[in-house]
Amino acid sequence: MEIKHVFFDLDHTLWDFEKNSRLAFGFIFEKYELNINKLKFDEIYQPINEKYWKLYREERISKEDLRYQRLKESFDLMEFQVSDEIVHLLAHDYIENLANYNHVFENTYVVLDYLKGKYDMHVITNG
């Protein structure tokens, strides 16, 4: 059987989600003038984000709940006071700004250049 197509999952394979996510959060925290420890936030947020993605994949929560609850729980664990209105705004702005950051993993372009012309390449994502 000849391989004709190669499929890539965008996040964590080609696109450096963690780096782009940190940059997007940094931007929106500055936009809303939130004096928050970004390193501590990232440490707390990452496992919470994974937990909510698991619930979403299991169809136990909606995408809107995923986006809101992961932030709300992170802020609560940090004991960082922020209104529900701001959490909703941050959740929305995070998604809007995430695509503005396009850092890829090392050698991504090398691999894609190697495969170009040999295979039909496709990018998929669940985000």
Positions of the model-derived regions?
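Substrate-recognition element of Asp-dependent hydrolases with the DxDx(T/V) motif
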Residues: 89-104, 108-127
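N-terminal helical cap/lid subdomain that shapes the substrate entry/recognition surface
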Residues: 2-10, 14-105
